[in-house]
């Protein structure tokens, strides 16, 4: 592969912060990309963390309007809820994030996109399939599926490499928030 540049869906959490360093060690030039879907996170701090960890660039994009108009409202109108109670909040955001990543990858001349999904859930499928449909020329790299680390291993890796993350062995998981989680 001649172009080793990729765009990483960056949340600022443990998986994707460790992924920046891991991908760099594998020879990738990492561009961190965060999409604001209405979460109550300090996006400037997330962008700064990506750069501190080693991303060559870090972008934050506002995806709130397309998320609401193209994903949330149509799904609510269709009654798309899980167990008759929960909107498919996280699931709805993944295709939009992937589509926006494809745009950034093309603009930046990247040959791949990457995400921090594990091999256990459906999020990986949403990223992988959306990318394959919109940009079959782009490789999809999934470090968490490849590296064989569990959460404690990731925390140890982060500590060893001086990566500051909002996770500890006592509280290793983060949660996902976006506009579809608000009460309407």
Identify the residue ranges that each predicted region occupies.
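Short linear loop/turn motifs
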Residues: 167-180
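Conserved small/polar residues in nucleotide/adenosyl-binding loops
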Residues: 182-184
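ATP-dependent adenylation/nucleotidyltransferase module used to activate substrates
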Residues: 1-166
């Amino acid at each position: 592969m001649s172009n080793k540049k990729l765009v990483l869906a960056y949340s600022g959490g443990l998986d994707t912060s460790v992924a920046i360093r891991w991908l760099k060690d594998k020879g990738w030039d990492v561009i961190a990309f965060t999409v604001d879907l209405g979460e109550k996170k300090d996006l400037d701090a997330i962008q700064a963390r990506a750069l501190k960890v080693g991303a060559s660039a870090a972008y934050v994009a506002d995806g709130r309007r397309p998320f609401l108009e193209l994903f949330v409202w149509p799904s609510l109108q269709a009654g798309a809820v899980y167990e008759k109670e929960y909107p498919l909040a996280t699931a709805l955001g993944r295709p939009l994030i992937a589509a926006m990543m494809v745009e950034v990858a093309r603009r930046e001349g990247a040959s791949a996109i990457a995400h921090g999904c594990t091999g256990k859930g459906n999020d990986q499928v949403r990223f992988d399939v959306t990318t394959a449909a919109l940009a079959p020329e782009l490789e999809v790299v999934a470090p968490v599926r490849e590296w064989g680390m569990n959460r404690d291993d990731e925390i140890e890796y982060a500590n060893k490499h001086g990566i500051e993350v909002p996770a500890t062995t006592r509280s290793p998981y983060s949660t996902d928030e976006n506009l579809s989680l608000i009460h309407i």
